[in-house]
Every structure is written in structure tokens, then in C-alpha cells.
Amino acid sequence: MALNVVILAAGKGTRMRSDLPKVLHPIAHKSMVQHVIDTAHQVGSDAIQLVYGYGADKLQAKLGEQQLNWVLQAEQLGTGHAVAQANDNISDDDTVLILYGDVPLIQASTLEALLAAREDNGLAILTVNLPNPTGYGRIVREDGNVVGIVEQKDANAEQLAISEINTGIMATPGKQLKAWLGQLSSDNAQGEYYLTDIVAMAHKDGVAITTAQPESAVEVEGANNRVQLAQLERAYQARAAEKLMLEGANLRDPARIDIRGDVTVGMDVMIDINVVIEGKVTIGNNVTIGAGAILIDCEISDNAVIKPYSIIESAKVGVDASAGPFARLRPGAELKQDAHIGNFVEMKKAVLGKGSKAGHLAYIGDATIGAGVNIGAGTITCNYDGANKFQTIIEDNVFVGSDTQLVAPVTIGEGATLGAGSTITKDVAAGELVITRVKQRHLTGWARPVKQKK
């Protein structure tokens, strides 16, 4: 049987007070619906039907490059009506897994448990027990067996006392699902076609109904307003922080880290407060990340130190290397083993060789720097002429004095020394000392201009 996933994502989300479709609001810099799509892939979906309605252009602009079957729900007439729009894309022998685009924290392990709980040609529904089930459909059982689901507005007093609620997530055989959807009625308090009504139909047809529950109730919580969205964000971050700690990271304060992607950490990693980790980030063993650092799509090797308020984006930091505080590695930058950049140093598409240092106030762009090089404060590689970029090459053991400009393309030979304040426009041979400063003049008897009083 193929696993056919239907994701309901047609709602506007009026309570969000936004022009953005509800399911595009982000958790950890990724839209809620993208979280659900990714989880569907994790459980081995063979096809994904995305039922959309409001904000179609924005949804397709955000998600359009993915392998999705787009299913329009022109009118929002309930969850049963929404699923029915995908009927043409469902085969009789499919297992249909129904998910929700605004329930982003559902875990693959929970869905795998739900699918495993489903008997042959049976219906499996995901339920959860809540201390306060107000607003949710209740699971009605007889002798322990599920016989139906009743919505809050249609429930009697006895049913309202039930704490086991329907999450809406279910796995069902394709053939029966299509038959049940054709029997739905809107004769209820909401005037909508409830997907939950198929549970009673399954019971009537003698179909085996089984249930599974998530590890945590937060997995099945949705976001209808920005307060709930923020609550889901905190829950996501808490889960991500816990995962890091279990993998070997020490978090100074687990409530003050922001994880917005996939991060892999080694042992004995120390992460201070207010660190942001985004995209795909790999952190080696014994790494220290200072407060306020931002790591984006980067690799940090063993024993490296990222000092406070540094930004490392699409860059590599080598073994025993360090950056910061207030340093910036832009895309294509790399610090080799034991290299160091200090405060207010920026690198872009540049390599700083083994043991080389740029301690402060420098820009290094489109450059290859060898081992044992000292880059003085205020050094700039002048790599752009307004139209084209050019390379600067600095070989091993070069000393670059403070306030030096290297006008690319230019090569500085091994062991050369560049005097402070020099502007280098031509290649420098190995071992040379180059000074291009204007000769210092001393003017005696000179008086500073005095401002005239008005």
C-alpha cells in the first residue's frame, strides 16, 4: 500500500490578523506547513496532497518548487469537505494519512506509532487526554471501543465530561475513506462537513478502529493566533535545546537559545545565552560559543572558540581557531587551524592560514592568506573596482603593518614585511620590506586656525 498524505492548509487564520495565510507563519524560521511536509517525508510518504484555499499565490510562491499535489478548496466548508477535494488523487489501496498545516510539532515517531496501530483496512486515530478538553471533539467509547467523535458544540453534558479528545490526525484506507466522505452531511451546529463523522461510519461498517497517543500533547496543538504561535515556538525551542543537551552540549540557559535549523554537536560543547543557530550547522568537540553569537550554515571544528556577538555564516572555523568578539565570517570564509580573528574583523570568500591572526578592525575579502601571517589593525584588501572583484594572495609568514591597503590583484611573497600605513598596488617579493608612506614633515612656527567670534 502506498502512503498518501493529505495536509489541510486552506484556512485564512483570521485571528492571526495578517495577510499571510495561517500555515505560512513560522516556527523556528520555517513555515508551520513546511514542518508538516518535512515530517510527512520522514514517515515515507509516497505522495502529498496539499489542500489549499486562501492565499494560494503566497503558498505556491513559498512551497511551489516541492513535489506536492495542489488541491484547491474553493469554499471552506469543513474538514470533511477539505479532504474530499483530494479524492481524485487517492487510490483505493492507498493508506491515507491526514495531517494539518497548522499543527507543526507532530513528530515522525508519533505518526509511525499511529500507522503501526492501524489494523489491516482499519481506521487509526490519534487521540490525547487533556485536563481541560474544552473546544475539542470528544472520543466516544463503548466497552473501551471507539464508536464515534462528537464535536464540542454538538456534545451533551455526559460527553462534555470526556477528557480524551480527537486531534484530527488519522490513518485510513483509501477506498473506505472516499465512500465515507460521500456520506457526510452538514446537518450540525456548525453547518459543516465534519471529517470526524467518518469514525461513526467506520464503526457502523464494522471497520476496526484503533487509537494511538503522542508522547506530548504539545505535538498536536495548533496555532490560531500569535499568542499560540509564540507558545509553539517556545515548545519547539525547548525540545530542540533538550536534544542538544542529550547529545553533549552544555547550555548556559536552555530557555535562551534559538535553534532554527539542523544542528549537530560533539561532546563538551559550551553554548552561552542568546545564541542563534540557523540552517545546517555542525559543531565539533570542546567548542565554546559565546553569548549572542549567530551561527548560520557553518562548520565549527574541535576546540574552536566563537567569542560573544560574532556572526559565522556559510563559513568554516578550523581546529583550535577562534573568532571574535564582534567578528564576522561571511560566506566562503575559512579560518584554518589555530587561526584567529578579533573584534570588528570581517572576512568574505577568504582563507586565513594556520596560526595566522587578524586581531582587530580589518576587512579581508577575496583573499588567500598563508600560515603564520600577522594582519595589523585597519588592514583592508581593496578587492573591488566598482565592476569586478580581484584576488589578494599573502604567502606564509608575512607581517602586514597597521592601516595597510592591499589593492588587488596583488601578491605578497613569503616572509615580506609591509610597513604601517602603506598602500600596496604592486606585487611584493619574498622577504622584502615595503613602505609607501609619504615622508613625515615637521613645520615649526605653525599656528592652528582660531574660530572667529560672531
From Swiss-Prot:
Catalytic residue list: H360 (proton acceptor)
* One GO process term, biological-process aspect: regulation of cell shape
Q: What is the protein name stated in its UniProt record?
A: Bifunctional protein GlmU
NCBIfam families, per database record = glmU, PRK09451.1
Q: Which organism is it from?
A: Shewanella halifaxensis (strain HAW-EB4)
Q: Which GO terms describe its cellular component?
A: cytoplasm; membrane
**Could you tell me the keywords of this UniProt record?**
Acyltransferase, Cell shape, Cell wall biogenesis/degradation, Cytoplasm, Magnesium, Metal-binding, Multifunctional enzyme, Nucleotidyltransferase, Peptidoglycan synthesis, Repeat, Transferase
Note the subunit structure: Homotrimer.
GO molecular-function terms, A-Z: glucosamine-1-phosphate N-acetyltransferase activity; magnesium ion binding; UDP-N-acetylglucosamine diphosphorylase activity
Q: Which InterPro entries match?
A: Bifunctional_GlmU, GlmU-like, GlmU_C_LbH, Hexapep, Hexapep_transf_CS, MobA-like_NTP_Trfase, Nucleotide-diphossugar_trans, Trimer_LpxA-like_sf
Residue numbers binding UDP-N-acetyl-alpha-D-glucosamine: 8-11, 22, 73, 78-79, 100-102, 137, 151, 166, 224, 330, 348, 363, 374
Name the lineage.
Bacteria, Pseudomonadati, Pseudomonadota, Gammaproteobacteria, Alteromonadales
Task: Please give the residue ranges the record annotates as the region N-acetyltransferase.
Answer: 248-454
What reactions does this protein catalyze?
Answer: alpha-D-glucosamine 1-phosphate + acetyl-CoA = N-acetyl-alpha-D-glucosamine 1-phosphate + CoA + H(+); N-acetyl-alpha-D-glucosamine 1-phosphate + UTP + H(+) = UDP-N-acetyl-alpha-D-glucosamine + diphosphate
